[in-house]
Amino acid sequence: MTVKDLFLNTPISKKISVKGWVKTFRANRFISLNDGSTFHSIQCVVDYENTDHEILNNINSGASIKITGVLTESQGKGQKIEIKVEKIEILGKCDPEDYPIQPKKHSLEFLRENAHLRVRTNTFSSIFRIRSSISYAIHKYFKENGFVYVNTPIVTGSDAEGAGEMFKVTTLDINNAELDSENIIDFSKDFFGKETNLTVSGQLEAESMAMGLGNVYTFGPTFRAENSNTSRHLAEFWMVEPEMAFCDLDNNMDVAENFIKEVLKYVINDCKEDLIFLNERLINEDKTKPLKDRNELNLIDRLNFVVNNDFVRINYTEAFEILRSSKPNKKKKFKYPVNEWGVDLQSEHERFLVEKHFKKPVIIYDYPAKIKAFYMRMNEDGKTVRAMDILFPGIGEIVGGSQREERLDVLKERISELNIDEKELWWYLDLRKYGTVKHSGFGLGLERLILFATGMTNIRDVISFPRTPKNAEF
């Protein structure tokens, strides 16, 4: 049985066996045992006088053991049930002298350095159970709403974002590779016969699938060779990317908002104990901060607030005017001033809008074309595109999406303006030649949603083994 089974279907007075890792061993009598199936540990009461002392000497924090005994109602405070131990088997010893995860509070930085062991702490086991629940809820939402799950390539020859910040994939010996007539590495000699990279997005391929299946989504790892060593960026992260045929920007925003709310609603119900623990953790953390830096709502209240309230929707021009006339901008508190229409909104601007001005999630739409990707549908004004971003408190941008440009001539013109090689996108242009339709989609960064759901502040703490500049340990 798992520890979770014991709490859900309590077989009082029955003999049971459970395996797990020792959290603590107090007074040579009380073992706190956890197997990862639930936040709660089960207390196991040892008969010290009648237990082999060699076994007792090996019951240390981190050791894996098998407990056999009778489940009883607890005689002490703090737990409803406990196991009266009849037999202990040591499955894996753990030397207390050099085990890094001691039963005390560790800094998050220390735990990042020991990412292979940090899941054994209460904080990280809760985070990763919530991550699992969110991932399940994502698939559940799309399945129930008629979407087809598709897989898009990890190795690709196209740059969906047009940013060029991609990891190259090659079998060539770079130090001895053949050069072409322009003194550039000749990738025609490479495995794929051309330059290839790890994907930055599955969007373009998902668009192709949507043109035959209707509504589709892809959910997988993406890679950005962006040299951003911040608490908000990863080089490898997970993206959820739905694409919808016969869908305009308004429909797209409706789906994105509903999707986020339904996923969070599922997690609130599925991960109650983990959220209660993380909520208490954040309340205690808040007490150490100045009053002005404390959260107005606790974690669980924030999640319920998002689920139960409409997101604000404003266009870019409205957002620009709010920011331009804001106190931080007038007093030059923004690192990036907002003075000219067309400026790309930074995280500080996004967070001001959601945390100070509206105090709720915000969807900004109709962005200037010059700061957005080539595939976004041009508006009639010729200056803005049918793009949208969803901004969350504490996070900034959590979703980016758009209505895609379905008109072949307009798309070709845009590709030319941005000096993108049209030959590389021949197949993408084909989608506009043969039965083109209005279509839209968006991308949600899984880790950013998990940040919001757990109250964590560093994106490296919500993925098992973070990949960041100069760091590919584990």
Q: What are these model-derived regions, one by one?
A:
Residues 2-245:
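Class II aminoacyl-tRNA synthetase-like tRNA-binding/catalytic domains
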Residues 87, 318, 448:
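Ca2+-coordinating acidic residues in Ca2+-binding motifs
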Residues 128, 246-250, 309:
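Short, charged/polar micro-motifs that form catalytic or ligand-binding hotspots
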Residues 131, 249-257:
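Short, charged, low-complexity patches
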Residues 160-166, 171-186, 258-390, 417-437:
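Metal-assisted phosphate- and nucleotidyl-transfer catalytic regions
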Residues 193, 198, 211-221, 234-248, ...:
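TRNA-recognition modules of translation machinery and tRNA-sensing kinases, especially anticodon-binding
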